[in-house]
Amino acid sequence: MESHIGVGVGKFIETEFESAKNHIWISSPTISQNIGKKLFDLAKKGINIRVLTSDKITNESDLTNQLAKKLILNNKNNNNLFPLDYKIVSPKEIPMIHAKIYIIDGKCAIIGSANLTENHFWNYAEYILVLREPDFIQTIKEDFEKLWNSCHYAEIDMPGTKKNFKDKVRKIRRGFTK
């Protein structure tokens, strides 16, 4: 087991992500667009990516969620197998997925305080544990699965969708009732 504390712990997480051969499982409340794009690039290279995240915690994370959904839909519409399973949890179900868990190839697990954003990786003082012991990794994998299976996929707003239009109409109506 290794521990890292302070500014810059992102280098340890990024190194592990880049070394992935089979899969990466992620639980994080927020994911920046840059880090999201790196993960999506890994999926394009055949690395199976599973992400459990929250809906609308930050604007940037919301954009990352929309990009993920768009990639999945585009690949599905083109009958491509795209190894990205991206579960966005509605705040109505769980206000926030706050667990930060990163499992790489079932051989490394990282837990700690760092979200998947540049600020958390490079600017904030964060704490992570990097575990390689099979017993610890197995426990963390089982815990991740419990959390994953206890959550449902949320519908997310995509620009230009029917729901987006209905929300705009509701806002206009509310303005007239005041």
Segments from the language model and where they lie:
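Glycine-rich phosphate-binding "P-loop"
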Residues: 1-8
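Short, surface-exposed acidic/glycine-rich loop or hinge patches that mediate macromolecular interfaces
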Residues: 7, 29-30, 134
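Short solvent-exposed loop/turn micro-motifs enriched in small/polar/acidic residues
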Residues: 92-96, 122
